[in-house]
Amino acid sequence: MSVPNSPEAPWAVGQLNDQVKNWIQRLGFIWVEGQVTQVNMKSTWRFSYITLRDVNLEASVSLTVETSALKNLATPVKDGDRIVVHGKPSFYSKRGSFSLWVTEIRQVGIGQLLAQIEQLKKAMFAEGLFDPRLKTPLPFLPTTVGLITGRGSAAERDVMEVAKRRWPAVRFRVINTAVQGPKTVPQVVDALQELERDSAVDVIIVARGGGSVEDLLPFSEETLVREVSRLRTPVVSAIGHEPDNPLLDYVADVRAATPTDAAKTVVPDVVQELRIISEARQRGAGALRNWVAHERKGLAQIRTRPVMADPSLPVARQQDIIAEALQRKDRALGVHVRSLRSSIESLKAQVNALGPSQTLARGYSIVQVIPRDKSGAQVVTTVDQVTPGSQLRIRVPDGSITAAAMGVQAAPGGVMNKNSNTTDSTDNTENGTGEA
């Protein structure tokens, strides 16, 4: 039955613990899997205490087990072991503490663990965490190398000695962690995060000098693998175990077979690099010498040309070409001008031959009628322009004659102007106009 609870009627601590105990006891017996991180056992104790942690999360639970049950196990339980326990959750209301009362312990065999790792590897492959396109290339010459390894381990010594021998100026930031057992994953993850935050670190090496399959299980934990996949700083895995590679080898940007190989992969050899530079300089110097020799040969060939013996020769040659071109221009222009003059004279002769002055010179005259309003005189081209009494101007070669029309007579077959006087037309025409 639910106990009322309100600001006016709060629970006492004992009531709270009793309620929690009732809720927990409803769970009944359950199976739980985890990794042993601590075992407190004495032969004189009736009960022993084990801390069991989640292999993927930062979570743990206390186990209470009879000491006799632990002694009867075929293999003693130790830190780092994977176990499956059967028990009932229990809550101690007086202390407010939780524990799992264990009635059975089963140790997880290595075969089963490897099967779980293989299943996890397939899942991560499908997820794309091991895609080569996600790999970050290593820097050519890192200034600072982050190193995660066991304190005072041979792996730490090998990496630093080889790296310093290859490139003495390289710097290291070393973080020592557990490299086997239940503390490995959380400590390595913390170290990775710390080095990732350090902007001076160009590459991270995770190194361990080999070990048994059981010792290397932490480097296949999902938590560690996913943390490495999130890093932007390139990671080199140097766990050093063949042929069963931990999952860290697959997610890392580069895998090295040993810590020594990791140092060789990350840090270039100064002697080799100097040799490469020296060879490149020699090739460059040789290429430059060949180029200079080739250019000198070409310059020598140019110097042997006649033009180089007398530098003014090309100028004189061009002057001759220009003078000849000017002469051709003058000749062509003279011919063209003479042709135009000849054409003008011919046209002038034609104009003169057809002009009025030449006509007058041949005995003809030009008759113009002068209107009564004294406007411009008009050349007479038809009898219709003249009436008896019209004032006429007759032009002859040496002057002009002013006359008056006595009469007008049309040519035979022509039409006579109705105003014309035909009586004296013959005499007037002969005496007044001459030839027209």
From Swiss-Prot:
Reaction(s) catalysed by this chain's protein: Exonucleolytic cleavage in either 5'- to 3'- or 3'- to 5'-direction to yield nucleoside 5'-phosphates
Enzyme class: hydrolase
Subcellular localization, as worded in the UniProt entry: Cytoplasm
Residues spanning the signal sequence: none
Residue stretches of biased makeup (Low complexity): 417-436
GO MF annotation: an example: exodeoxyribonuclease VII activity
Summary of the function given for this chain in its UniProt record: Bidirectionally degrades single-stranded DNA into large acid-insoluble oligonucleotides, which are then degraded further into small acid-soluble oligonucleotides.
Name of the protein this chain belongs to: Exodeoxyribonuclease 7 large subunit
